[in-house]
């Protein structure tokens, strides 16, 4: 079976279109909701009120409201690289991290699990059944190449239309070597999705000038070039969605990272506003500011209205 047919068969299994066209960041009942993280020195800043925020829609300041995040559960799709390079200690640390993340989910929070090598597999759909999720994590095994582009698309589709707060959490340790989707196709997918994207990637030092084929760029690249391109692409995608890229030099920190990210997800702010009528169709730029000196603000850069 060819690379394209492997990917296509998974998309058809989920009832997804072959071409990733127009998954929308939807404006429900003409109210726009922006998921925002505010931090300083790597730590969340909780307890900010409405007056601490300024939100600009196409350069115009809007009146905003803050939704109590404790009343809106999480819908998190966890997308795990299980290619051959993850075998051994790395996989054990990865599984421990995901188990800890699942244990930290509360109440009506839901999670889904997707694993990928050159195949993309939906291990568990969105569920609040912790036992099902733990079993799905234990069932993964490493083999094959890496198709994280296609897996990210599947993760975004899994939370599309979610009634809770949609988040995709991606782990990958390598450059894409097998996907149907190319680098330049990913940013429009993320911008049109309503999900916040987080990504975790190890920073590995490989000796020598070795090369490997990059499916995402359709060319041969050195390991250093691959790492640089992957990091740049992941940072672009996560920042566009209002999420973050986490790089780690130690896979032994994965459990801590997963736990910290779940805590961060629970301390984000939900801002809402109503655009003035008539609402122009197409892309609208969003900028969020806070009146806290030195604070970092992570929020999506805009929304589509159709």
Can you name each region flagged by the protein language model?
Residues 15-306:
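Scaffold/interface architecture of coatomer-like assemblies
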Residues 3-15:
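Bacterial N-terminal signal peptides
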């Amino acid at each position: 079976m060819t690379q394209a047919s492997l990917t296509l068969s998974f998309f058809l299994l989920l009832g997804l279109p072959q071409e990733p066209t127009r998954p929308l960041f939807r404006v429900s009942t003409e109210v726009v909701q922006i998921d925002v993280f505010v931090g300083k020195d790597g730590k969340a800043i909780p307890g900010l009120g409405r007056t601490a925020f300024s939100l600009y829609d196409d350069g115009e300041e809007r009146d905003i409201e803050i939704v109590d995040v404790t009343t809106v559960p999480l819908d998190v799709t966890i997308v795990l690289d299980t290619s051959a390079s993850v075998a051994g200690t790395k996989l054990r640390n990865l599984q421990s991290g995901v188990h800890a993340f699942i244990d930290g989910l509360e109440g009506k929070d839901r999670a889904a699990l997707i694993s990928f090598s050159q195949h993309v597999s939906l291990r568990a759909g969105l569920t609040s059944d912790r036992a099902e999720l733990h079993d799905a994590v234990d069932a993964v095994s490493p083999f094959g190449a890496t198709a994280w582009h296609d897996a990210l698309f599947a993760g975004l589709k899994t939370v599309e239309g979610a009634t809770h707060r949609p988040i995709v959490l991606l782990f990958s340790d390598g450059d894409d070597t097998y996907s149907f989707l190319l680098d330049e196709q990913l940013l429009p997918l993320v911008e049109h999705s309503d999900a916040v994207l987080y990504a975790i990637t190890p920073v590995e030092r490989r000796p020598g000038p070795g090369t490997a084929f990059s499916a995402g760029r359709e060319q041969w690249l050195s390991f250093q070039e691959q790492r640089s391109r992957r990091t740049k692409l992941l940072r672009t995608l996560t920042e566009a969605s209002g999420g973050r890229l986490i790089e780690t030099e130690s896979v032994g920190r994965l459990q801590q990272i997963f736990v910290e990210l779940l805590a961060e997800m629970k301390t984000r702010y939900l801002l809402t506003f109503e655009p003035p009528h008539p609402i122009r169709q197409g892309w609208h730029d969003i900028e969020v500011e806070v009146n806290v000196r030195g604070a970092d603000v992570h929020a999506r850069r805009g929304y589509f209205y159709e």
